[in-house]
Amino acid sequence: MSLLLFLLSFLLDGPQGQMESYFLQVQRIVKAQEGLCIFVPCSFSSPEGKWLNRSPLYGYWFKGIRKPSLSFPVATNNKDKVLEWEARGRFQLLGDISKKNCSLLIKDVQWGDSTNYFFRMERGFERFSFKEEFRLQVEALTQKPDIFIPEVLEPGEPVTVVCLFSWTFNQCPAPSFSWMGDAVSFQESRPHTSNYSVLSFIPGLQHHDTELTCQLDFSRMSTQRTVRLRVAYAPRSLAISIFHDNVSVPDLHENPSHLEVQQGQSLRLLCTADSQPPATLSWVLEDQVLSWSSPVGSRTLALELPWVKAGDSGHYTCQAENRLGSQQHTLDLSVLYPPQDLRVTVSQANRTVLEILRNAISLPVLEGQSLCLVCVTYSNPPANVSWAWVTQTLIPIQSSEPGVLELPLVQREHEGEFTCAAQNPLGAQRISLSLSVHYPPQMSSPSCSWEAKGLHCNCSSRAWPAPSLRWRLGEGLLEGNSSNASFTVTFSSLGPWVNSSLSLLQELGPSLWLSCESWNTHGAQTTSVLLLPDKDSATAFSKGAVLGFGITALLALCLIVVIVKTLQKKGTQEEPSRPKLSRGSTILDYINVVPKTRSLARNWKAEPDAPSRSSPLDTHFPKPKKKQKDPHFTYPGCPDPTSSSQVPVSENNPEELHYAALNFSRLRLQETQDPQDTYSDYTEVRVH
């Protein structure tokens, strides 16, 4: 019987031609993760109708060495066949062998399952082991479930989360699902045949940044996936970090409200905010937006100030905003720097005249005017501003406001260099100006004397700018250095002083008018000399003496009247002790040169003889230029125009004329001596 079976088996497994009719189609390499389920598709073909065999068809899967008689199959459709112990319950022949389907299902894959597997078919006396086989490669379990959840959860709004584990064959057993996390309060139960699990809950702000885990448990293994919940909320925890020269500033309170930085340093301000969804960050200086971030970008925004300057001071605000709200913080940046842009504003006679920006400026000021100097600088911390001057003959009035220097009444003693100094702990700056006091001509009383060659007169005047000086003889003008047969004029000047000497070589007629004129841009002054030569007739000594005493009394009376009127006018106009001259004003002083007799005269008659023409200043002096009117401007610290100490000048009387002229041409001397001695000596009588 055994021999018959062997022969039949040989015939069935015999020649090569018959073996080619058997073929198995299966994947050569099959990979599976430990603990999971794997399905291996398989089909085969075999010769048909060689023998009519009604025996059942069995299929077997073996692993390892091809010796079916020495091993147990791992899976078969023959219920009477004993299976390998480790494969029981895990390997399953799912294919319908009658339909030549040899598909294999492996559950709970283990590391020991890694080997080669071949298939064998049996039907009665027909038995054949296919040469085609597959190799199972077992790998570590890395497959995880997938969790489907909204990216951002709205607080107070219900949310549904799905955990899904996918595999390729429905016959694989479903794992057991479980949820873990702070948001888990209720779990929906699902049958084990389902490959997903659903979790519903209502998120709150307390759930933000917490973990939610979905875990799958198989028979011996488990796998899980964890997600972090992101619950939407308005910006919070906004913070500003400060870096000086790329170094973090230590010992600063969180979100400082004030920051001091020295000019020239580099500064980096870093703004951060916590929000969900990410907020849009922006830096704002006052009302100007300096920079902003993208909502999908970083949660930080840096503001770079590589070279801090004075103009960078201000209120810097970092603002974070999303659809749920906003938050902001303001930093007051104070840039420290030494005094700079030092300048002086000059106000003369209560009007702003100019602004001085550099050193060594000469400032002309009219004597008697008010002057206000305001020194201004930019610095932080505020600079200590002070004034200093070289000449201290008269101490100027220092205003209570720093940097303001007031001179209510400028005098010549104030001339000199004024220096404004501004200083703070970071540095100092100075600016100087030279004060030049201008004033109109002031003439000293001229002197005249008779010399051997004729009359010699000297005239001097002082003013700034230096005045011009000339003589007027009758209708003629004598100036500079000039001479001819009738006169010689010599001119000299030194600083504010000018001097002119006149020598008259011609015979002098009666009532000859001689004057000395001086002027500059601020005014003019004239001193007149009335020459009264006597006639050659002689008079009695006694009469001349009597008349001389009478004339002397009359002269004294005239002087008293003139002085009283002058004092009354000065009292009504409240003039200062020093004459205050306006542009274009003229003062005329008169001096009379009269004979001085050696003997008493007799039978004198006095008859006044006024000049036959008006003052030459009315027609021959250059008219002063009108000053252009400046707009009124009251600078802080300068005196108000109503408190001006400048002496007012009468517009109705631009010229003041004070003179007294006496004519002695008709007085005759007593013939007690030679008439030639009558003009030998002269004396000076000055009337101001």
Swiss-Prot record:
Tissue: Expressed in B cells with high levels in pre-B cells and B1a cells of the peritoneal cavity.
Cytoplasmic compartment spans: 565-688
Glycosylation site positions: 195, 246
Free-text comment on this protein's domains from its UniProt entry: Contains 1 copy of a cytoplasmic motif that is referred to as the immunoreceptor tyrosine-based inhibitor motif (ITIM). This motif is involved in modulation of cellular responses. The phosphorylated ITIM motif can bind the SH2 domain of several SH2-containing phosphatases.
Function field: Putative adhesion molecule that mediates sialic-acid dependent binding to cells. Preferentially binds to alpha-2,3- or alpha-2,6-linked sialic acid. The sialic acid recognition site may be masked by cis interactions with sialic acids on the same cell surface. In the immune response, seems to act as an inhibitory receptor upon ligand induced tyrosine phosphorylation by recruiting cytoplasmic phosphatase(s) via their SH2 domain(s) that block signal transduction through dephosphorylation of signaling molecules.
Main location: membrane
Residues with PTM Phosphotyrosine: 659
Descriptive protein name: Sialic acid-binding Ig-like lectin 10
Domain Ig-like C2-type: 145-228, 250-334, 339-436
Record PTM: Phosphorylation of Tyr-659 is involved in binding to PTPN6.
Family, similarity comment: Belongs to the immunoglobulin superfamily. SIGLEC (sialic acid binding Ig-like lectin) family.
Positions in the Extracellular compartment: 18-543
UniProt keyword terms in alphabetical order: Adaptive immunity, Cell adhesion, Cell membrane, Disulfide bond, Glycoprotein, Immunity, Immunoglobulin domain, Innate immunity, Lectin, Membrane, Phosphoprotein, Signal, Transmembrane, Transmembrane helix
Annotated S-S bridges: 37-172, 42-102, 163-214, 271-318, 375-420
Domain Ig-like V-type: 26-138
Topology relative to the membrane: Single-pass type I membrane protein
Lineage: Eukaryota, Metazoa, Chordata, Craniata, Vertebrata
InterPro entries in the record: Ig-like_dom (IPR007110), Ig-like_dom_sf (IPR036179), Ig-like_fold (IPR013783), Ig_I-set (IPR013098), Ig_sub (IPR003599), Ig_sub2 (IPR003598), Ig_V-set (IPR013106), SIGLEC (IPR051036)
Motif (ITIM motif 1): 588-593
Disruption phenotype: Cd22/Siglec10 double-deficient mice develop autoimmune disease, which is not observed in single-deficient mice.
Residues spanned by motif ITIM motif 2: 657-662
Any Gene Ontology biological process: regulation of immune response
Binding of N-acetylneuraminate, residues: 120
Subcellular location: Cell membrane
